[in-house]
Structures are given as structure tokens and as C-alpha cells.
Amino acid sequence: VRESGATALHYLGVLPAILLNIPENKNDKNHSVKFGFGAGVNPKHHALFEKRFGFPLIEAWAMTESGAGGCIAASHEPRHVGNCCFGKLTDKVSIKLIDENGHEVSEGAPGELLVRATGDNPKYGFFSHYFKNEAATAETWKDNWLHTGDVVRQGEDGSLYFVDRR
């Protein structure tokens, strides 16, 4: 990273833990990185990583099926570092959180994340279908909502927190 002059990087959740296991070095902050973008950093490593390496890890939620149309990112303060927060909705994305029976959960309760584009075309920016698998497509897109299988809760300020996979 230092040699490339990169100013942004993409990370997977395990990478901060791996880098934190490397012995500290006086050059840990000697780079041009302004931020990292990814998902799944262990809450106990998030603040430690940012302090040691000197740049924020911007947590986000997306999946292949959501494409760019459903990406949600913690790109605005407060980011709620260290508790699996992946940001707030934008005006381009709508969500619902449902229980195992398909009913919306009460405020603050965890539920499966359903997501779609806001506006006339709920699939705008999302995947169109699974290749040669109409049944799987129908199972994933129900009633114009993408069923993600991710369990999420929404905080009082609208921030979204990853809880688990269904």
C-alpha cells in the first residue's frame, strides 16, 4: 500500500485482525491511505486498527444481488465504531426488517433485512435474475423486496447494525 500510493482500499472483515497481529512498526502510519471500505471488521478490532494505522474503516452493507443500488455505508459521522454499524439509509434505498413469519419487527428489534430501490422501479441498480434459476430468483425477490438473509437492527438514530445471518 505504501509503495503504490493508494489513497483508498477495500478490505474484508478478517484483514484488520490479520494486520493487527503483525508487530507494530514506526511506519504503520507512513502511507497515503485516507480510508478503507469494506464489511465485517470485528468490533474489538475496529477502533484499535484506526488508531494504529491512522485511517477510518468505513463499514458497509451490500451483496452481489443488491448491486450498487442497495449499498448502505457508514460514510457519515457518527459512524458508531466498534459495534457492527454499517450506516444509515439514503433516499435511494428502502428497507424493511421482518421476523420469521414475515411481519415487520418493532423499533430496535432485529429482523431480516429486506431492501429495494426507492421509486418506481424497486429493482433499479439490483441484479435482474439468477442465471437459469427462476425459482431462486422468485425466492429472493418477493413482493418487490430483495430478501437478504441478513439479520439487522435499526437504532434510534436510524443507524443500521449487522446482527447475524439467518
What are these regions (language model features)?
Residues 15, 37-45, 88, 115-116, ...:
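Alpha-helical "lid/cap" subdomains adjacent to substrate-binding clefts that gate access
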Residues 94-96, 112:
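Residues embedded in well-ordered beta-strands
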Residues 83-89, 140-144:
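Short Gly/Pro-enriched turn/cap motifs at secondary-structure boundaries
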Residues 72-75, 86-88, 104-109, 128-130:
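Active-site glycine/GP-rich loop and adjacent strand/helix microenvironment
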Residues 2-12, 20-80, 94, 101-104:
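Gly/Ser/Thr-rich phosphate-binding loop
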Residues 62, 87, 150:
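Active-site glycine-centered loops adjacent to acidic/histidine catalytic or metal-binding residues
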Residues 106, 114-166:
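Conserved ATP-binding/catalytic segment of the ANL
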Residues 99-102, 110, 156-157:
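Residue-level recognition of short loop/turn positions
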